[in-house]
């Protein structure tokens, strides 16, 4: 199953605290590897530097917890299950046809 993960850095401290946290998260990231069962299709940073997005695929929700918990002190997460657009369009068309069949 595919997921879009949105992360927003927790910039709630003083400038010095935020700078220290930025260095720490980079140290942690440099040692991190994705869980074996998770494929990262895309990992991008926001242009404003305040977070990023990932498109990941896994059949095990624990892979998401494994990753987000390692970075939880530094970021807030929102995780959305997603489908490829062709599948989403097909299902939407089927839903419309279903509703139209009811008189």
Regions found by a protein language model. Name each.
Residues 1-50, 84-85, 89-103:
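Short S/T/G/P-rich N-terminal loop/turn motif that feeds into the first structured element of a domain
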């Amino acid at each position: 199953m595919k997921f879009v993960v949105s992360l927003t850095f927790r910039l709630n401290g003083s400038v010095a605290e935020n700078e220290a946290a930025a260095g720490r998260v980079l140290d942690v990231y440099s040692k991190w590897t994705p869980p074996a069962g998770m494929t990262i299709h895309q990992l991008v940073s926001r242009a404003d530097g305040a977070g990023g997005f990932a498109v990941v695929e896994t059949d095990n929700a624990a892979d998401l917890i494994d990753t987000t918990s390692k970075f939880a002190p530094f970021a807030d997460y929102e995780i959305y299950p997603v489908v490829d657009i062709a599948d989403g369009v097909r299902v939407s068309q089927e839903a419309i046809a279903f509703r139209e069949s009811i008189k």
